[in-house]
């Protein structure tokens, strides 16, 4: 049976780890074991936080909508309920954007949620 030299495979593996660890501080970008641990941890955090990001943005949108709707004299939950009853299908992302960038348009949406006619 012939002998298998692993230098090509090992170098490829090391290069991959060091490429992922580029920009890390100190030994985390220079030593293989430390870099491997740092890369694995970073990838785990990235995986987790891609899911957390969705939650965080939804919380931010709700906070912005709530603040803008309370300024109009309506709570967030009553606003969402009113929009659902008046068959207005605007998602929270767009609603928060309207609340921040177009206060006049948002006040018209609040009137729709209250069940009043928009002039």
Swiss-Prot record:
It comes from Syntrophus aciditrophicus (strain SB). Keywords: Ribonucleoprotein, Ribosomal protein, RNA-binding, rRNA-binding. NCBIfam families: rplT_bact. Binds directly to 23S ribosomal RNA and is necessary for the in vitro assembly process of the 50S ribosomal subunit. It is not involved in the protein synthesizing functions of that subunit. Gene3D superfamilies: 6.10.160.10, Ribosomal protein L20. GO terms for biological process: ribosomal large subunit assembly; translation. The keyword rRNA-binding applies. The lineage of its organism: Bacteria, Pseudomonadati, Thermodesulfobacteriota, Syntrophia, Syntrophales. Belongs to the bacterial ribosomal protein bL20 family. GO terms for molecular function: rRNA binding; structural constituent of ribosome. This is Large ribosomal subunit protein bL20. The keyword rRNA-binding applies. It holds the Pfam family Ribosomal_L20.
């Amino acid at each position: 049976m012939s002998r298998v030299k692993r230098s090509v495979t090992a170098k490829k593996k090391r290069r991959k780890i060091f490429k992922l660890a580029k920009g890390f501080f100190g030994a985390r970008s220079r030593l293989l074991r430390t870099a491997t641990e740092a890369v694995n941890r970073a990838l785990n955090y990235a995986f987790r936080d891609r899911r957390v990001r969705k939650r965080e943005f939804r919380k931010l949108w709700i906070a912005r909508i709530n603040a803008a709707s309370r300024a109009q004299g309506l709570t967030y939950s009553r606003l969402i309920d009113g929009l659902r009853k008046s068959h207005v299908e605007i998602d929270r992302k767009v609603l928060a954007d309207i609340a921040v960038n177009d206060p006049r348009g948002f006040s018209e949406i609040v009137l729709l949620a209250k069940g009043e006619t928009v002039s």
